From Swiss-Prot:
Region annotation (6 X 2 AA approximate repeats of H-G) ranges: 146-158
Name this polypeptide is given: Proton-coupled zinc antiporter SLC30A1
Protein family according to the UniProt entry: Belongs to the cation diffusion facilitator (CDF) transporter (TC 2.A.4) family. SLC30A subfamily.
Modification note: N-glycosylated at Asn-299. N-glycosylation promotes endocytosis and degradation through the proteasomal or lysosomal pathways.
GO cellular component, one term: cytoplasm
Subcellular location: Cell membrane; Basolateral cell membrane; Cytoplasmic vesicle membrane; Cytoplasm
PANTHER family: FI23527P1 (PTHR45820), PROTON-COUPLED ZINC ANTIPORTER SLC30A1 (PTHR45820:SF1)
Source species: Homo sapiens
Length: 507
C-alpha cells in the first residue's frame, strides 16, 4: 500500500499540473502563432494521457491476487501500460517530425516572443518538478523477492527477516520459522506474487476493503496450511518491473526537452531576429516572393529599405524539434522493445538457454530435459517450466533441489518441474517423453509442430538425442498398414482357430 500510495500521489500531482499547463499552452500558441508552443502543448496532452494510463495500470498492478479468470492477477498491467505509453510517444515523435518538415518548407515568424519565453520557462519548471518526482524510475535495479514451485512444492526468498511465521496446522505444534528458512513440516512460502488466501483457494487482496479478513493479520496458504503473518510484511518493491513508471518518466523528460526548445527558440528569436516595424518599408528575403523583380526595383529607387533577418533564426525551431525527436526515439525504443518482448514471452536476454539446458542435463540423476520454456512475467520475475526425466522416483526430491539451484544460478526463481521416470529395464539410447500428447492436439500445443524423428537406417547413424512428446506420438502411429488382400487371410485363420469365439479384426 505504501508503494502504491507514493506513486499514486506523484501521478495525481503531476496530472493536475500537466493538464492545467496544457490548456495554457494551447491558448498562448494560438495568440502568438507559435508552432513550437503548439507542438509542446500536444506533447503535454500526451503526458496527460500517459499519466492516466499509468494511474490505471498502477492500480491494477497492485491486484496481484489470483482469480478464476486471471491466475497471475493484474501483475502485467504495468507492462501493458508501458507499451501503450511507448507507442503513443513514438507516434507523437513522428507527428512532431512532420510539423518540423513543414516548417522547413514554409518558415513562420514568431509573434510576441517574450510571452512565449515566459510560458516556456514556467513549463520547464513544471517538468523539472516532474523529473524530481519520477527520477528514481529512470533506470532498473534487481529485485530480490522470488518464489518457486517444484512438482507441487513451493518456497520463497527475499522476505524481510524480522517477522516470524506461525504454523496453524491441525495436529502439529507451533513452529516459528523465519522467512527464507524451512521447518520440519513446512515448505517455504511461494512469494512470486504476494497473496492472501480464502477457504476456496482463491487469493484475496489484503488492501481490498471488501476483504473481510483484512485487519492486523492476514492468512497465507503454505502447502495447504493456513499461516498468519502481519500486514506489514510486504515484498521489496520490484523496481525492475517499473516499466510503466519509466514510461511516465520518459514522457516528462520529453516534455522538458520541448520546454527547453521553446525557451531557446524564444531567446534566440528575441535577440537575433530583426523584424519589420510598422510604417517602414521592409522586405523579408527569408520567404519566397513572387514579386522579386518588383522588390529589386523598389530597392533601387528607395534609399531606406529595411530587410528582416537573419533567415537562419526561422530554421532554428524546426532544427531543434528534429533533435528532440531523435532524443525521444532513442530513449523510447528500449522501453518499447522490452515491454513488447515481455508480452511476447520471449526468453529474457540475460538467460543463456543453451547453457541452462546443458547444466540441467549434467545434473546427476537426470536422463533428459525437454519441453523447457523460460519467459518473463514482469520485471525480474522470470518463470521456467520443464519436463525432467529421472532414473529413480525415490531420489527425485534431491534431484529437484539440485535443479532448483541451477535455475537459481541463472536468475530464474519461479520454476515448475514435471517429473518423468524411466521405465524399469529401459536401456534405449533414445529417451522419449513419457507423457506423449495425442496427435490431434499437436497444433494446439505451445510449440506447434516439430520435425519428424529419423527412422530406419538414418536412425542408426544418428546419435542419441532427446525426442519430444509430439515426435513420439507421431512415430507410434506410423505403423505399416495392411492392404485389403492381406487382411482377408488373417481373418480366415482366426475363424478356423477359434470357432467358438467372435472373430477379431485388427482393423
Amino acid at each position: 500500500m505504501g508503494c502504491w500510495g507514493r506513486n499514486r500521489g506523484r501521478l495525481l500531482c503531476m496530472l493536475a499540473l500537466t493538464f492545467m499547463f496544457m490548456v495554457l499552452e494551447v491558448v498562448v500558441s494560438r495568440v502568438t502563432s507559435s508552432l513550437a508552443m503548439l507542438s509542446d502543448s500536444f506533447h503535454m496532452l500526451s503526458d496527460v494521457l500517459a499519466l492516466v494510463v499509468a494511474l490505471v495500470a498502477e492500480r491494477f498492478a497492485r491486484r496481484t491476487h489470483a482469480t478464476q479468470k486471471n491466475t497471475f492477477g493484474w501483475i502485467r498491467a504495468e507492462v501493458m501500460g508501458a507499451l501503450v505509453n511507448a507507442i503513443f510517444l513514438t507516434g507523437l515523435c513522428f507527428a512532431i517530425l512532420l510539423e518540423a518538415i513543414e516548417r522547413f518548407i514554409e518558415p513562420h515568424e514568431m509573434q510576441q516572443p517574450l510571452v512565449v519565453l515566459g510560458v516556456g520557462v514556467a513549463g520547464l519548471l513544471v517538468n523539472v518538478l516532474g523529473l524530481c518526482l519520477f527520477h528514481h524510475h529512470s533506470g532498473f535495479s534487481q529485485d530480490s523477492g522470488h518464489g518457486h514451485s517444484h512438482g507441487g512444492h513451493g518456497h520463497g526468498h527475499g522476505l524481510p527477516k524480522g517477522p516470524r511465521v506461525k504454523s496453524t496446522r491441525p495436529g502439529s505444534s507451533d513452529i516459528n520459522v523465519a522467512p527464507g528458512e524451512q521447518g520440519p513440516d513446512q515448505e517455504e512460502t511461494n512469494t512470486l506474487v504476494a497473496n492472501t488466501s480464502n477457504s476456496n483457494g482463491l487469493k484475496l487482496d489484503p488492501a481490498d476493503p471488501e476483504n473481510p479478513r483484512s485487519g492486523d493479520t492476514v492468512e497465507v496458504q503454505v502447502n495447504g496450511n493456513l499461516v498468519r503473518e502481519p500486514d506489514h510484511m510486504e515484498l521489496e518493491e520490484d523496481r525492475a518491473g517499473q516499466l510503466n513508471m519509466r514510461g511516465v518518466f520518459l514522457h516528462v523528460l520529453g516534455d522538458a526537452l520541448g520546454s527547453v526548445i521553446v525557451v531557446v527558440n524564444a531567446l534566440v528569436f528575441y535577440f537575433s531576429w530583426k523584424g519589420c516595424s510598422e510604417g517602414d518599408f521592409c522586405v523579408n528575403p527569408c520567404f519566397p516572393d513572387p514579386c522579386k523583380a518588383f522588390v529589386e526595383i523598389i530597392n533601387s529607387t528607395h534609399a531606406s529599405v529595411y530587410e528582416a533577418g537573419p533567415c537562419w533564426v526561422l530554421y532554428l525551431d524546426p532544427t531543434l524539434c528534429v533533435v528532440m525527436v531523435c532524443i525521444l526515439l532513442y530513449t523510447t525504443y528500449p522501453l518499447l522493445k522490452e515491454s513488447a518482448l515481455i508480452l511476447l514471452q520471449t526468453v529474457p536476454k540475460q538467460i543463456d538457454i543453451r547453457n541452462l539446458i546443458k547444466e540441467l542435463r549434467n545434473v546427476e540423476g537426470v536422463e533428459e530435459v525437454h519441453e523447457l520454456h523460460v519467459w518473463q512475467l514482469a520485471g525480474s520475475r522470470i518463470i521456467a517450466t520443464a519436463h525432467i526425466k529421472c532414473e529413480d522416483p525415490t531420489s527425485y526430491m534431491e534431484v529437484a533441489k539440485t535443479i532448483k539451484d541451477v535455475f537459481h544460478n541463472h536468475g530464474i526463481h519461479a520454476t515448475t518441474i514435471q517429473p518423468e521416470f524411466a521405465s524399469v529395464g529401459s536401456k534405449s539410447s533414445v529417451v522419449p517423453c513419457e507423457l506423449a500428447c495425442r496427435t490431434q492436439c499437436a497444433l494446439k500445443q505451445c510449440c506447434g509442430t516439430l520435425p519428424q524423428a529419423p527412422s530406419g537406417k538414418d536412425a542408426e547413424k544418428t546419435p542419441a538425442v532427446s525426442i519430444s512428446c509430439l515426435e513420439l506420438s507421431n512415430n507410434l502411429e506410423k505403423k505399416p498398414r495392411r492392404t485389403k488382400a492381406e487382411n482377408i487371410p488373417a481373418v480366415v485363420i482366426e475363424i478356423k482357430n477359434m470357432p467358438n469365439k467372435q472373430p477379431e479384426s485388427s482393423l
